[in-house]
Swiss-Prot record:
Protein name as it appears in the record: Fe(3+) ions import ATP-binding protein FbpC
Originating gene: fbpC
Bilayer disposition of the protein: Peripheral membrane protein
Assembly, per entry: The complex is composed of two ATP-binding proteins (FbpC), two transmembrane proteins (FbpB) and a solute-binding protein (FbpA).
Protein purpose: Part of the ABC transporter complex FbpABC involved in Fe(3+) ions import. Responsible for energy coupling to the transport system.
Length: 353
């Protein structure tokens, strides 16, 4: 394999309709070369349609798609200089790992010997050197996934597309393989467009996350930006659970805001907040609970569940039920206990209305 040539991706006012249904209404986005960008969102948000448009498996109703600055809008899939890793891996069961990786090269016109050499190099690249003789059935789920990645990379695409590549793996293997994908992408420097509905997966692998909703971009930013500074209640709750309650921003200056919640004042990062009514996103682990509620923000224990290293509570308050994660597992709070809710310094974000 020669050096990776990472390419940029640009969608310019792309609309995709299926009959009378508009899956993507006027979508514009940019992916910088050498970055891993994740399209994240609930089912039906348009993330897979976006990936399929980029792959050439669908064509836009209007707008332009560029890869590496080249207009590929009307090009077939095999002329776009992108490779895709499918959710099912799509490995041929009767072919060895080496034959699977070499297949795309041979189909592209490489001589058999050169295709085999490149395939062997590709397998080494993903940590499967010496395993080219094995059939897919003789590999673990994680190894099959790496064969699929190797098959895509040996074609030396400008952009690698990954369509929910970890969805068929169990939770423990998923964590390990997502780390391997991220390390490989950083080591080789290729551009990757990654689709998932798993927030933890997106946070772990991405340079940039694009959260999609109803065919549009709800928010784009780094994993830290989206988690710590959500632009809306939807983003706050989607990027890890969040309790959203009304608040009033009293003042905001020098990067710090003073807010009032349930009659009590608190200091939180301002993040462009303005003095006016707003909402406060509260992460489940951003509060402590104290028995015997006094004034201010208080509630009653409605439900608790012991999960080994933490206890999950539902607290009934005047603003509805709050979901709280408490690492203090020595003794759980009994049901119907009145509690005061105290904020920690992290895990709070103002959402401007």
């Amino acid at each position: 394999m020669t050096a990776i040539r990472p390419g940029s991706v640009t969608f310019e006012n792309v609309t995709k309709k299926f009959g009378n249904f508009t899956a993507l209404p006027n979508l514009s986005l940019t992916v910088e070369p050498g970055t891993l960008v994740t399209l994240l969102g609930p089912s039906g948000c348009g993330k897979t349609t976006t990936l399929r448009l980029l792959a050439g498996l669908e064509h836009p109703t209007s707008g332009r798609i560029l890869v590496g600055g080249k207009d590929v809008t009307n090009l077939p899939a095999n002329e776009r200089d992108v490779s895709m890793v499918f959710q099912s891996y799509a490995l041929f069961p009767h072919m060895t790992s080496l034959e699977n990786v070499a297949y795309g090269l041979e189909s592209s016109g490489f001589k058999k010997n050169e295709a085999r050499e490149r395939a062997e190099e590709g397998l080494k690249l993903v940590g499967l050197g010496g395993m080219g003789h094995r059939l897919p059935a003789e590999l673990s789920g994680g190894q099959q996934q790496r064969v699929a990645v190797a098959r895509a990379l040996v074609l030396e695409p400008q952009v690698l597309l990954l369509d929910e590549p970890l969805s068929n793996l169990d939770a423990r293997l998923r964590r390990r393989v997502r780390t391997e994908i991220r390390e490989l992408q950083q080591r080789l420097g290729f551009t990757a467009d990654y689709v998932t509905h798993d927030q933890d997966e997106a946070l772990a692998v991405s340079d940039t996350i694009i959260v999609m909703k109803e065919g549009g971009i709800a928010q784009k930013g780094s994993p830290r930006d989206l988690y710590e500074a959500p632009a809306s209640a939807f983003i706050a709750d989607f990027m890890g659970e969040a309790n959203v309650v009304p608040c009033e921003v009293i003042s905001a200056e020098n990067g710090e805001a003073v807010i009032r919640v349930a009659g009590l004042t608190h200091r939180v990062p301002a993040r462009n907040a303005q003095p006016r009514p707003a909402q406060l996103a509260i992460r489940p682990n951003a509060v402590t609970l104290q028995p015997q509620a006094g004034g201010g923000f208080s509630g009653t224990v409605a439900h608790s569940a012991y999960l080994g290293d933490h206890i999950e509570y539902e607290i009934e308050t005047e603003h509805g039920k709050l979901f709280i994660v408490d690492p203090a597992v020595e003794q759980s709070l009994p049901l119907q206990t009145d509690v005061s809710i105290q904020f920690k310094t992290r895990g709070l974000a103002i959402i401007n209305q």
